[in-house]
């Protein structure tokens, strides 16, 4: 169950962060509406992925995904835009990922 959940979180992050990045590129970097449109499609697809999480609680899944989004956004920025996080960015992402583990995978 944990493996499936992690894969779904990674897929959700790629779709949401990638979609937002495509919209940003289309509008802010003036790459055009095709980029922005592709981003909107990716963002829409992200909305479906959370529904496949093994945990049935929407609030828990989306709260935990927030931590994945934090770390994933920093990683995306590093890969796609050459962003270099400082130690506080890394520390914050680590705290967020610990939160993901507690929220999603702590024994209940």
Curated annotation (Swiss-Prot):
Q: Which InterPro entries match?
A: UPF0060 (IPR003844)
List all disulphide bridges recorded for this chain.
none
Highest taxon, organism lineage: Bacteria
Q: Give the record's keywords alphabetically.
A: Cell membrane, Membrane, Transmembrane, Transmembrane helix
Where does this protein reside within or beyond the cell? Cell membrane
Q: Name one GO cellular component term.
A: plasma membrane
Q: Which Pfam families did the record assign? A: UPF0060
Membrane topology recorded in Swiss-Prot or TrEMBL: Multi-pass membrane protein
- The regions listed as transmembrane in this protein's record are 6-26, 32-52, 61-81, 87-107
* Entry similarity comment: Belongs to the UPF0060 family.
Designated name of the protein: UPF0060 membrane protein MSMEG_3252/MSMEI_3169
């Amino acid at each position: 169950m944990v493996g499936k959940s992690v894969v779904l979180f990674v897929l959700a992050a790629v779709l949401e962060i990638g979609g937002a990045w495509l919209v940003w590129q289309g509008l802010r970097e003036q790459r055009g509406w095709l980029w922005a449109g592709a981003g909107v499609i990716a963002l829409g697809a992200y909305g479906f992925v959370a529904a496949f999480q093994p945990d049935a609680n929407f609030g828990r899944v989306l709260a935990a995904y927030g931590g994945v989004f934090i770390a994933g956004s920093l990683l995306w920025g590093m890969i796609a835009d050459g962003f270099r996080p400082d130690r506080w960015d890394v520390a914050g992402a680590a705290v967020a990922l610990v939160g993901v583990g507690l929220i999603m995978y702590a024994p209940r």
